[in-house]
């Protein structure tokens, strides 16, 4: 070593690096243990205690009763009922049919302002409305009679 200057500190650094690597590798090695293997957990049965000293079937029963009570409450609130007899089915059908006919009739009724006269409304506006609307046969006959009466008065 006398021939290589500075070899002493280099050997020390190399030895330290080798020691760190060996320590890392040694930490990854698995040492066999002499302890017996861990016992398997008992199988899950209906008598298994889940929590609060309640068995599994207790928990399932309480949960299903809770879900059933929610379903019954919602059906009562929204009036969901299955008809049981033929009469009830036919009555429900007729009721829906009558409701549909009623709504169809309501759609054909014109708005209230078209059915009644508004006080203070100009007669010119009324005439414009008549021109904009579709004339019926009765309106045309009345207009023809008025025109004929004017012509007869004009001739006399």
Curated annotation (Swiss-Prot):
It is found in: Membrane. Residues 1-27 form the signal peptide. GO terms for cellular component: membrane. One of its GO terms (biological process) is sensory perception of sound. Keywords: Deafness, Disease variant, Membrane, Non-syndromic deafness, Signal, Transmembrane, Transmembrane helix. InterPro entries: TMIE. It is a single-pass type I membrane protein. Expressed in many tissues. Pfam families: TMIE (PF16038). Residues 28-57 are extracellular. The chain crosses the membrane at residues 58-78. Residues 79-156 are cytoplasmic. Residues 113-135 are annotated as: Disordered. Forms the MET channel composed of TMC (TMC1 or TMC2), TMIE, TOMT, CIB (CIB2 or CIB3), LHPL5 and PCDH15. Auxiliary subunit of the mechanotransducer (MET) non-specific cation channel complex located at the tips of stereocilia of cochlear hair cells and that mediates sensory transduction in the auditory system. The MET complex is composed of two dimeric pore-forming ion-conducting transmembrane TMC (TMC1 or TMC2) subunits, and aided by several auxiliary proteins including LHFPL5, TMIE, CIB2/3 and TOMT, and the tip-link PCDH15. May contribute to the formation of the pore. It is linked to Deafness, autosomal recessive, 6: A form of non-syndromic sensorineural hearing loss. Sensorineural deafness results from damage to the neural receptors of the inner ear, the nerve pathways to the brain, or the area of the brain that receives sound information. This is Transmembrane inner ear expressed protein.
